[in-house]
Amino acid sequence: GIFDKLKNFAKGVAQSLLNKASCKLSGQC
């Protein structure tokens, strides 16, 4: 359903934001 799509989209966005943040913190960008 649409809610599943939204949930998956939000999960993907959160994941990429986390990846960017941890990459900046560890200085491995």
Swiss-Prot record:
<keyword id="KW-0204">Cytolysis</keyword>
<keyword id="KW-1015">Disulfide bond</keyword>
<keyword id="KW-0878">Amphibian defense peptide</keyword>
<comment type="function">
    <text>Shows antibacterial activity against representative Gram-negative and Gram-positive bacterial species, and hemolytic activity.</text>
</comment>
<dbReference type="GO" id="GO:0031640">
    <property type="term" value="P:killing of cells of another organism"/>
</dbReference>
<dbReference type="InterPro" id="IPR012521">
    <property type="entry name" value="Antimicrobial_frog_2"/>
</dbReference>
<keyword id="KW-0354">Hemolysis</keyword>
<keyword id="KW-0044">Antibiotic</keyword>
<dbReference type="Pfam" id="PF08023">
    <property type="entry name" value="Antimicrobial_2"/>
</dbReference>
<keyword id="KW-0929">Antimicrobial</keyword>
<feature type="disulfide bond">
    <location>
        <begin position="23"/>
        <end position="29"/>
    </location>
</feature>
<dbReference type="GO" id="GO:0042742">
    <property type="term" value="P:defense response to bacterium"/>
</dbReference>
<keyword id="KW-0964">Secreted</keyword>
<dbReference type="GO" id="GO:0005576">
    <property type="term" value="C:extracellular region"/>
</dbReference>
<comment type="similarity">
    <text>Belongs to the frog skin active peptide (FSAP) family. Brevinin subfamily.</text>
</comment>
<protein>
    <recommendedName>
        <fullName>Brevinin-2Ee</fullName>
    </recommendedName>
</protein>
